[in-house]
């Protein structure tokens, strides 16, 4: 068993560190970052627990986590590749945001789209096995994975519009899942090449920490915060030109007011509902513009990662014992 009772305390301290970091990343924007005392305490807890964990592991004879595992270049590469993958994989929110805001779909229909990821995983798994048997170098397989992630973002860039089709939203899900499977399955294979068995538990800890905790938390916080900021930017930008002097906005506003009055609403209620309707249309358009912009930047990031993993040196290393 990779952990005994004596090492359980070390693992608990490590989990406290990750919990505090995740709390700060998840609720920082909601709680206005360090103006909230809980964010301050969580940061202090993460720093103190992290330092305590490192101290215990360095001074203990049989540590839970062996820091020597980070001396292996393939492990460091695996750490980096997993981080890039899971951060960019947070772009999966584009489909949910677009279908929820632009198409007004419910959670069940959004969840149904997610089922198409199984097809992408199947395609990616078969392609990975076939290309590996053919002897294709790891760097080209990694590049293919990031390429598929970029193609998914590019599809969303051109597809995001006011008249998008629900049936077409399965394609970015399939493409993204295919690319994710390339990287998800090959990174541990590459990272553990000729790795001494004594580092197995440390590698598993590193892999799960990056893949399941740190990178998804950072990616989700990054994409959600940037989406909110760009959404507010476009709302301010579009609202500047929407007034009674604008022909289309004025006609739509007056039509809504008249429609509400025909339904028995008072003039004030009709005006308020027309203003709410106008605000809603601006918000939808701003959200779609923000998603399109972020999809474009995600495409650039994927292309950068694709080039990066190709030009990165993959030297042979000796077996460490």
Task: List each model region and its residues.
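Small-residue-rich alpha-helical segments with characteristic i,i+4
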Residues: 169-249
